[in-house]
Amino acid sequence: MDCYLLLLVSYVIFVILGYKKFELPIISPTMITLVSLTIVIALGYWYRYEMGTDLYFYTFIVIALGGGAILGTGYGIQRWAKLNWGDPTSIENNFDSNCYPLVGIVNLPVRYKYISMYMIFFILFSLFCVFINTTGDSDASRMTQYRDIILYPQLHPNDTRFVFINSQFYKIAWAITYVSAYVAIYNGVILNKPIFKGTGLLTIVIFFCIGSSIAMGARQPAIEIFIFMILTYLFLMVKEQYFDQVKRFLFKLIPITIISPFLYILYGILVGRHDGNNVTLQRVTELLAGGIYALNIHIWEPARTIYFGQSSFADVYDKLINFGLLPESARMAYHEFDKFGNTLSLFGRWYEDFGILGVIIMSIIVTALFSLAYEYLQRRSNGNIWTHVWTAIFLTELVSLVWAGYDDRIRALLAFSQFVIIGLI
C-alpha cells in the first residue's frame, strides 16, 4: 500500500469536501490549513523516490486523523455560528460601507514620507549593528556571523552591542508596516482606492523587508508581511461578498505561489543562509516536505519529554525558564535535522507530547479557536474601530496556519499568549 499516495488523496478529498460540500470560505482557518498541508504533501509525494522511503501506515493515520479533525471542527464551528449568530450578511444588510472609511474612524493620517525616513534609519542602524559586531571582508560572511549572534547570543556575550536596541527598532518598524498595509488594503477594498499607487505602501514594505532581514538575520518577517497582505485582502473581500473578484485574485496568485519558494531560498543570501545558492526544486521540496519525512522517521522514537506538553508548549516553558521559575532542563531539546529543517510538520510536537489522541484533541482546540474568531469577525460591523484592531491581530496570527506544513512557527499557535489573543477576540 502506498501510504503517501493515500495521504495525498485523503487531503485532496478534505479540501474538496471543505470547499464544495461544506462551503467553507477559502480564507477560513480550516481551508488555509488544509490547503497548506495538501501542497506540502503533494510536493513530498513527488519527491518520494529521492527520499528513498515511503510513509509508515501509522504516520498516515496520525496525519490523516489530524486533517479530519481540522475539517470536522471547522465545519462544526461554521454551522454553530450560523445557527447562533446568523448569516454573515445579516448584520451588514443595512450597513453602507462607503460611509465608514477606516482612515476616518481611526483618524490616522499615514505620513508615508516620515515612515520611509524611519525605515531608512532602521536599515542603516541595522547595518551598523552588523559591522560593529562582526569581522571579515565578505558581506555574506558578516551576515552569517550576525545571524549566529542573533540565534545564540549566549555564545557571543561580547558581540551583542546595540542588538537589543535594534530589536526594539524592529518592533516599531514591524508595527508601522502592518498598520500601513491594513489601512491601505482596507481603503482599497471598501473605498475602491489604489492600494499601492500614490500610497507609498510598496516603498514601506520593501524597506521593511530589507531592514528586518538585516536586523533579525531571518527571511521570515519579509515573507510574512506579504502573506499578511494577501490574507487581509481576501478576508475583506469575502466579508464584502466580492466572491467573483476573490476567484480571479486566487487564479492570479497561482504563478506567484509557484515561484515564491524559489525566491524564498534565493533571499537567504541576504540573511547569511548557506542554502541561498541552491535554488532548485529539490531544495524547495526538502524544505517544504521535510517535516513529514522527519515525522515519519521519528514516529516510533519521538523526542523524550519530561514535563507536561514540553514540546507543544515550548514557548510557554521558555518564558518560565527565562523568569527563573523552571530549571534549564525543562527547555525543549528540539530534534535537529540538517537535511529537513527544524520542523516535524504541523502534528509532530503534539504527537511527541500526547500521542495520536493528543494530535486529534489539539487539532480540534486550535481549529475551534481560530474558526470562532473568524466567524465572529466576519459578522462585526466595519464601523467599529475595535473590529479593525482585532481583525489585524487575528490576521497576523493566521499567518501561522499558512506555514502549517513547513515552518516551526506553528509552535507559537500553542503559546499561552496566542490562546489569550484569540480568546479575547
Report residues per predicted region.
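Membrane-interface helix-loop-helix junctions at transmembrane boundaries of multi-pass membrane enzymes
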Residues: 22-27, 184-200, 375-389
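Hydrophobic, membrane-inserted alpha-helices
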Residues: 10-15, 41, 180-184, 204-212, ...
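Hydrophobic alpha-helical segments
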Residues: 342-425
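Membrane-embedded catalytic interface detector for glycan/lipid assembly enzymes
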Residues: 83-217, 222-242, 261-273
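Small-residue-enriched transmembrane helix-hairpin modules in multi-pass membrane proteins
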Residues: 146-167, 251-254, 260-371
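N-terminal "leader" segments that precede or initiate the main folded domain
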Residues: 1-120, 199-209, 225-266, 404-425
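Hydrophobic alpha-helical transmembrane segments
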Residues: 3-11, 14-22, 44-49, 115-129, 167-182, 186-191, 208-216, 340, ...
